[in-house]
């Protein structure tokens, strides 16, 4: 009995001890919660050169993981979409002239009407294409001369990636009371300037995605986003393999992307970050290979001109930069395809979570 009483007395805690124990448990819970929050909070830095499709990925995250675009938000893209339509048709008409492709009389009249509308534009920033000009643009687009130029020479001159999408839909896009759809917004091209952030929840995890401009003048801003990055999402345009940098036409655009990627992954700032590479515009890459062999731009490429061989060469090119293969993941993407981006982003997150658990000894 005495021994039992002693045991009981030894198990009792004074009020101070009970208070300290309660406080200790509260601290443990708080630390555990902070640790859990840290595991569940991902900062993604979205990087890539101009026109890689980086901002399209950013828009897709809003579509997939937030509420998309309300009517008033969508209407802010109307002038941008109409500007893209004007740019696309201008590029095609100019290419016809450059390649000596002549229009028949009625098409030339529509081309003249289109050019006259451009000359009279007073406010390009607030551009709205009238219905009658939209119909005119549609006739020019469907003319034999424009179709010949597009079908046989579209990879031989600068052309907006979404030119076909916008031209195929020009009548709808210029109707009265037109409100841009999600796909219209996803396809539109606008240069990113400054730093844009998007916070969203996915698979019970909180994400913050940071998008900065890809133009050379914007890259100096990247350093301001480098704190506490969990994942670098680097976007490379696969279709750039035979393109020169418009800001400095001495440099191949894909080789330039490679050099920037190498600098990023070798930086001490990102030694703990996972690296995800999106090889974007894969659909355009496959089409281009039919008329522009990879070996023409990469002299050290010894494979054939098949999609599989060319793709693996480019993958290996970027993979050579990586020292920790466990933290590197690569996917082929088409940024304008919402389903594709949903699938590959989900796969990337799953790989990273599993790797983090493995590194922590919590997963085989």
From Swiss-Prot:
Lipid moiety-binding region (N-myristoyl glycine): 2
InterPro entries: Gprotein_alpha_su, GproteinA_insert, P-loop_NTPase
G-alpha domain sequence ranges: 40-363
Binding locations of GTP: 48-55, 186-192, 211-215, 280-283, 335
Region annotated G4 motif, chain positions: 276-283
Region (G2 motif): 184-192
Chain positions recorded as Mg(2+) binding sites: 55, 192
Stretches for region Disordered: 1-29
Pfam families per record: G-alpha
GO molecular function terms noted in the UniProt entry: G protein-coupled receptor binding; G-protein beta/gamma-subunit complex binding; GTP binding; GTPase activity; metal ion binding
GO BP annotations listed: adenylate cyclase-modulating G protein-coupled receptor signaling pathway
Region (G1 motif): 43-56
GO cellular component: axon; cytoplasm; heterotrimeric G-protein complex; neuronal cell body
Superkingdom, taxonomy of origin: Eukaryota
UniProt region (G5 motif), positions on chain: 333-338
Sorted UniProt keywords: GTP-binding, Lipoprotein, Magnesium, Metal-binding, Myristate, Nucleotide-binding, Transducer
Assembly behavior: G proteins are composed of 3 units; alpha, beta and gamma. The alpha chain contains the guanine nucleotide binding site.
Function of the protein: Guanine nucleotide-binding proteins (G proteins) are involved as modulators or transducers in various transmembrane signaling systems.
Family: Belongs to the G-alpha family.
Protein name: Guanine nucleotide-binding protein alpha-6 subunit
Species annotation: Caenorhabditis elegans
Lineage of producing organism: Eukaryota, Metazoa, Ecdysozoa, Nematoda, Chromadorea
């Amino acid at each position: 009995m005495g021994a039992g009483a002693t045991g009981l007395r030894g198990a009792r805690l004074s009020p101070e001890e009970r208070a300290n124990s309660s406080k200790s448990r509260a601290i443990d819970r708080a630390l555990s919660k902070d640790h859990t929050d840290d595991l569940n909070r991902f900062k993604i830095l979205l990087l890539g050169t101009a026109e890689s499709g980086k901002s399209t990925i950013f828009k897709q995250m809003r579509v997939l993981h937030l509420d998309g675009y309300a009517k008033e938000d969508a209407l802010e893209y109307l002038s941008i979409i109409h500007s893209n339509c004007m740019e696309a048709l201008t590029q095609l008409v100019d290419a016809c002239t450059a390649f000596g492709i002549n229009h028949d009389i009625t098409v030339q009249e529509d081309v003249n009407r289109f050019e006259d509308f451009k000359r009279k534009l007073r406010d390009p920033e607030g551009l709205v294409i009238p219905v009658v000009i939209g119909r005119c643009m549609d006739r020019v687009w469907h003319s034999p001369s424009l179709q010949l130029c597009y079908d046989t020479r579209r990879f031989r001159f600068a052309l907006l990636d979404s030119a076909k999408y916008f031209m195929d839909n020009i009548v709808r896009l210029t109707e009265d009371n037109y409100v841009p759809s999600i796909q219209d917004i996803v396809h539109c091209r606008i240069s990113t300037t400054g730093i844009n952030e998007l916070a969203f929840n996915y698979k019970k995890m909180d994400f913050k995605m940071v998008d900065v401009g890809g133009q050379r003048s914007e890259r100096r801003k990247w350093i301001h986003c480098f704190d506490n990055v969990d994942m670098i999402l680097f976007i490379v345009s696969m279709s750039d393999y035979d393109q020169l940098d418009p800001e400095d036409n001495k440099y191949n655009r894909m080789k330039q992307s490679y050099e920037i990627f190498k600098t990023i992954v070798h930086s001490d700032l990102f030694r703990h970050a996972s690296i995800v590479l999106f090889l974007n515009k894969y659909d355009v890459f496959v089409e281009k290979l039919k008329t522009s062999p990879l070996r023409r731009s990469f002299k050290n490429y010894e494979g054939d001109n098949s999609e599989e061989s060319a793709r693996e060469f480019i993958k290996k090119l970027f993979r050579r930069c990586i020292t920790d293969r466990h933290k590197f993941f690569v996917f082929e993407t088409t940024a304008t395809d919402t389903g594709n981006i949903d699938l590959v982003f989900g796969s990337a997150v799953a790989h990273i979570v599993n790797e983090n658990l493995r590194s922590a000894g919590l997963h085989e």
